[in-house]
Amino acid sequence: MTKLSYRQAMLIKHTAWMNTRLLARGPRPEDARYVPLAVRMLTLVGCLNYAMLDLESELTASGLFHHETKRRYTQAQTLVTQAHGIAWSMLRKIDDRAARQYNDKTDEAYRCISDCILLEAPQRSYNIVLSLCRIISSLNGRISGRYNFNPAKPLVRIPALLECIGIEDCKIDGIIELNLTD
């Protein structure tokens, strides 16, 4: 058994007391505002994972997937995979049903995004990736500390990583946000 100092024991007691008060009080009013934003952001992180896979196949098919592009794409894909994996495992820890709903919502959202963007490949996937990164960053910035998803913060670097591809950014953020419904 480890010995605790008096201050440590009092801190543990106070933390336990505060937790019981928070549970008894129920959700805070700002939870009603932040939860839909957090759900949308996590869904878009999943969509970004799909968009990166589409981007790889479209770049390969068009012959633009050269050494420097592959290297930078791999760095970007690593960032996306980490964020998506953490989001999925976080929801799976809550409940298996929550993880399945996350997958279903992500599939539906990506299908909607793909259907509303009428650009040609690989410009289509490239613009979807860049726009999703900007939207995720914007949503994450609007969410307070409790719902803030720190693994999504590095996704801001993806547009700079993929800049070497040389495809024009059409800034389709508004189109994606307009077509996504909760």
Predicted features and spans:
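Long, low-complexity or tandemly repetitive, helically biased scaffold regions used
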Residues: 5-179
